[in-house]
Amino acid sequence: MNYTPITEENIEKVATLYMNHYNQHSGGCWTYEKAYKRIRQMVTMEDSLCLMQEDDNDIPTGLVIGYLESYDDFTFYYLDEILIFGEYQNKGYGRLLLQEVEQRVRERGAQMIELVCPDDAHHMHFYGGFGMAEATNLRLMK
């Protein structure tokens, strides 16, 4: 498995993959421009860690976007989105990608990963496999 940083030089490729995945597999209505803007916002953020996952034949299998956030005595990685492309889901690619992210953010000084995910059994099972649990000290406000 190969992990390539998503940078301003490869956003076009990533935006196309992102748009196609959500439009084909999730009934999305993404345009290339909106996908490009979303990925670029994360990539250009200070202390971002955004990766493209590719198999050994250089075929993209997924991506992760997020950033490190620092406080006076604590740094965490906010995992904004992890995406495994449709045909690669439920084959261990997500586990490998999150393991890679864990290693890289620890090397950069993060003590933990924080995220918001859908409240369903699939996501709870996936993240629970990494020792993550629902935060009891936070409430989502809208």
Positions of PLM-derived features:
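A conserved beta-turn-beta hairpin within the catalytic core of GNAT-like acetyltransferases
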Residues: 69-79, 89, 133-135
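Conserved beta-strand in the GNAT
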Residues: 52, 59-68, 76-78, 83
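Conserved acetyl-CoA-binding loop-helix of GNAT-fold acetyltransferases
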Residues: 84, 90-103, 129
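A short helix-loop-beta-strand connector motif used in the catalytic cores of GNAT acetyltransferases and
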Residues: 40-52
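Conserved active-site alpha-helix within GNAT-family acetyltransferase domains
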Residues: 95, 107, 111, 119-137, ...
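Conserved hydrophobic beta-strand within the GNAT/NAT acetyltransferase core sheet
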Residues: 79, 113-117
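A short beta-loop-alpha structural element at the N-terminal edge
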Residues: 1-16
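Conserved GNAT-fold acetyl-CoA-binding loop/helix
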Residues: 8, 19-40
